[in-house]
């Protein structure tokens, strides 16, 4: 039994080590498209207007969390994950930004911290959200 368990551990470790998801010899360059408390400056429309120039130098742009938060913030206290109208702009502006990046050869990476969440009244009182006809609480 011990040999079977040890074999299983080695197989799982090998699979985990090879499943990192990032190309082995990736030579691209990523730009962080925001800085601390930059929601006044880092509008989706501002980044979109810079997409052509960024495309000459960068392969990926890391953008902040885009869900709706309470008040103006950097996005790390989202109240709603499926509502993309945030301090950075509207969902339509976000989609236009991603398209502009794609058209200029830039990938987009969203910075999402899943366990950072704003509540309604206490630590576990989150608002209900509906996505594709299913309501989540």
Model feature map: region roles:
Residues 1-4:
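Positively charged n-region of N-terminal signal peptides that target proteins for export
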Residues 21-52, 56-137:
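Substrate-binding/active-site clefts of carbohydrate-active enzymes
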Residues 10-18:
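Hydrophobic h-region of N-terminal signal peptides that target proteins for export
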